[in-house]
From Swiss-Prot:
One GO MF term: zymogen binding
Protein name as annotated: Immunogenic protein MPT64
InterPro entries, alphabetized: DUF3298 (IPR021729), Esterase_Immunogenic_RsiV (IPR053421), PdaC/RsiV-like_sf (IPR037126)
GO cellular component: extracellular region; peptidoglycan-based cell wall
Family label: Belongs to the RsiV family.
Keywords assigned by UniProt, alphabetized: Secreted, Signal
Compartments, as annotated in UniProt: Secreted
Organism domain of life: Bacteria
Gene3D superfamilies: Fervidobacterium nodosum Rt17-B1 like, Heat-shock cognate protein, ATPase
GO BP annotations listed: cellular response to starvation
Keyword Signal applies: yes
Residues in the signal sequence: 1-23
Gene it is expressed from: mpt64
Pfam families: DUF3298
Amino acid sequence: MRIKIFMLVTAVVLLCCSGVATAAPKTYCEELKGTDTGQACQIQMSDPAYNINISLPSYYPDQKSLENYIAQTRDKFLSAATSSTPREAPYELNITSATYQSAIPPRGTQAVVLKVYQNAGGTHPTTTYKAFDWDQAYRKPITYDTLWQADTDPLPVVFPIVQGELSKQTGQQVSIAPNAGLDPVNYQNFAVTNDGVIFFFNPGELLPEAAGPTQVLVPRSAIDSMLA
């Protein structure tokens, strides 16, 4: 009898253990059908109609937001590439990424900034930025609104710095309409660093589209009192 009871208990334990050993959840790189090299997530797809090359960091705290953006961008591109008439050259989608960090109190931050190049049958190829920022202390995304302390108005300080730096970059005096330079909509892509905040501007936001994408570091010394 004791032997039978022992065998029954052993069988139950083995059955329970086998149920626990479930497959590990997929990483966001696996969800995107990419290859994780340990340092980067590489996604490559090719067809006579298109080429896709995407390079992302292996890890980012807000993986779901990054995954959703990449999936939507890729799927929209594929829809255009596969529904268009044949071309001499395939459509191109190239996405590269750069990471930024800040360790200055009261909160550490981490950011991923994507540079998205698309040649999808338009008059000209386009290159745009998309930034994702993460608050390490509060474990949540940082938006333009939560970047700043409440009841502050940073753009009257930020805009002249941006305009001056863009003039230096272009080698000529840049004139930006105040309604564009003071519009928070144009400052949604940014990365916080120890030195300040880098703002990334897409073509047509502050400068004409022909100027392409631009970026400006606004020194921390100019805005530190307004940062949240």
